[in-house]
A protein has these predicted regions:
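C-terminal and inter-domain tail/linker signature
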Residues: 1-149
Length: 149
């Protein structure tokens, strides 16, 4: 795997909210510590991920019914995390997917609102830190653009 100069696990300057999101992701989403939901997540948590319910109970149900039963759930690594105002963005790699989580925090530093983007890896063993090469094949297929020439 290509060295990641932005690796959140090696950074010493993480903000409090970046640390909270990493803890939540590691211990709740990819772990088994459901008790953290009651302290790290706002009671009126808003979920924008289609199919996942609202509030703490929505997260709890997703983790117990889906996340805890997902193959390879513990095999993940954060690639990038950054804070901008009330938002923290986490880019992470799983065995078959890349995911971007966008989280808004409330004044109590709890997760208050969530969006995500899930993308299958373009190829098995894909290294997202490796420099890209010119090959539009996946874009032709993804966007339905006819090839020229």
């Amino acid at each position: 795997m290509t060295q990641n100069p932005y690796d959140p696990l090696k950074r010493t300057d993480l903000s409090h909210r970046e640390q909270v999101l990493l803890k939540f992701t590691a211990e709740v989403v990819h772990g088994t510590n459901l008790a953290l939901i009651d302290t790290l997540v706002a009671p009126d948590y808003v979920q924008h991920t289609h199919g996942v319910g609202q509030g703490r109970e929505g997260i709890r149900r997703y983790v117990t019914e889906i996340s805890m039963r997902r193959a390879g759930r513990e095999q993940w690594r954060p690639l990038l995390v950054f804070e901008d105002g009330d938002f923290v963005i986490l880019y992470k790699l799983l065995p078959a997917f890349m995911i971007v989580d966008i989280v808004r925090f409330n004044a109590e530093d709890q997760l208050a609102e969530h969006w995500d983007i899930v993308q299958p890896l373009p190829a098995p063993g894909h290294d997202p830190m490796e420099l890209s090469q010119h090959d539009f094949s996946r874009f032709y297929a993804l966007f339905g653009v006819p090839r020229q020439g």
